[in-house]
Amino acid sequence: MFPMVTEFMNYGQQTIRAARYIGQGFMITLSHANRLPVTIQYPYEKLITSERFRGRIHFEFDKCIACEVCVRVCPIDLPVVDWKLETDIRKKRLLNYSIDFGICIFCGNCVEYCPTNCLSMTEEYELSTYDRHELNYNQIALGRLPMSIIDDYTIRTIFNLPEIKP
């Protein structure tokens, strides 16, 4: 055939292909128009975390036997355990325990391998501060239980996100 006719046929095929792609994109856009928004208004609305959420670590001073298993299983050797050997009873006495949450990767190994269950993960995830040194928690700060989001009347809790159907 003539070169002009073949170029015109290619142009027609490309136009049809482009229109099909635009139509497919428009259909995807229309399918998303019926969904609820996923964004929540953070300080006023908060999600209820799942049962297995790994938040701030809670520490119970009385249960700790200063075995330092948490330090050995931590990938970054983060917990600082200070203890003194009591010679009369031949046992370790815990003096100080601290974790720097600015460095912690929240892997949960310390909680999982603790033989006395003195460590546990809480649902607290709001650890932001203006000074990074405030993220170094000692045994007193680690022993504080977090305030439950459900009990706070100023915050609207969202129990689950709307399910996205494909």
Swiss-Prot record:
Co-factor remark: Binds 2 [4Fe-4S] clusters per subunit.
4Fe-4S ferredoxin-type domain sequence ranges: 55-84, 95-124
Pfam families tied to this protein: Fer4 (PF00037)
UniProt GO molecular function: 4 iron, 4 sulfur cluster binding; iron ion binding; NADH dehydrogenase (ubiquinone) activity; quinone binding
Catalytic activity: a plastoquinone + NADH + (n+1) H(+)(in) = a plastoquinol + NAD(+) + n H(+)(out); a plastoquinone + NADPH + (n+1) H(+)(in) = a plastoquinol + NADP(+) + n H(+)(out)
Listed GO CC annotations: chloroplast thylakoid membrane
Cofactor field: [4Fe-4S] cluster
A GO biological-process term: photosynthesis, light reaction
PROSITE patterns: 4FE4S_FER_1, 4FE4S_FER_2
Record's subcellular location: Plastid, Chloroplast thylakoid membrane
Membrane topology: Peripheral membrane protein
Leading EC class: translocase
Family: Belongs to the complex I 23 kDa subunit family.
Oligomer status and interactors: NDH is composed of at least 16 different subunits, 5 of which are encoded in the nucleus.
Name of the molecule in the record: NAD(P)H-quinone oxidoreductase subunit I, chloroplastic
